[in-house]
Amino acid sequence: MTDLALIDAGGANLGSVRYALERLGVEARVVRDAQGLQGAERVILPGVGAAPEAMARLRAQGLIEPLQQLQVPLIGICLGMQLLFEHSEEGDVDCLGMLPGIVRHMTPALGIRVPHMGWNQLVPMRDSALLAGLPERASAYFVHGYAAPVTADTVAACDHGGLFTAVVQSGLRCGAQFHPERSADTGARILRNFLEMSFP
């Protein structure tokens, strides 16, 4: 069985992500410091809340550099995905810098509410094993007011007043802006794909 580390960065979705993994028959150990990452074969960084507080917590736990230097597959979920980018407009905070791009506040418009809450369709942008087995018009559940831009690393986008990154992968670094633990079959498939796929 894969040694799976689930980082406690203070997000309220930690328990629900853990339960989603248990439904897949996978047990994760909760990690709160750099020592806990030792021996991990896969790492999940969940997160709910604000980027400045999450980065401060990771810094207090001594996890910034260990995450940046990680040599095993990592997936960030929701705020956890945003933290993988260079910077966030939320609190004007520098993030982990593991993916290029700046996370920006979503702009409300006629018929476009911010925060973006609810089910929305994924728009595939390129091939990735992260999307294996998903139906053509798969939908996922989103709750966020900030979003990462579409880049060359974007695997799937989503449209809410403009396209943003919904799923990202660059080498060992992956992310999902939506909540897999609240996205029914789509979320379960993404988590299973991350745990089982081969990485370069």
Swiss-Prot record:
CDD domains found in the cross-reference section: GATase1_IGP_Synthase (cd01748)
Transmembrane segments: none
GO BP terms: L-histidine biosynthetic process
Pathway(s): Amino-acid biosynthesis; L-histidine biosynthesis; L-histidine from 5-phospho-alpha-D-ribose 1-diphosphate: step 5/9
GO molecular function, one term: glutaminase activity
Active site: 78, 179, 181
NCBIfam families listed in its UniProt record: IMP_synth_hisH (TIGR01855)
The protein's role, per its UniProt record: IGPS catalyzes the conversion of PRFAR and glutamine to IGP, AICAR and glutamate. The HisH subunit catalyzes the hydrolysis of glutamine to glutamate and ammonia as part of the synthesis of IGP and AICAR. The resulting ammonia molecule is channeled to the active site of HisF.
HAMAP family associated with the record: HisH (MF_00278)
Protein's name according to its UniProt entry: Imidazole glycerol phosphate synthase subunit HisH
Organism of provenance: Xanthomonas campestris pv. campestris (strain ATCC 33913 / DSM 3586 / NCPPB 528 / LMG 568 / P 25)
Source species taxonomy: Bacteria, Pseudomonadati, Pseudomonadota, Gammaproteobacteria, Lysobacterales
Name of encoding gene: hisH
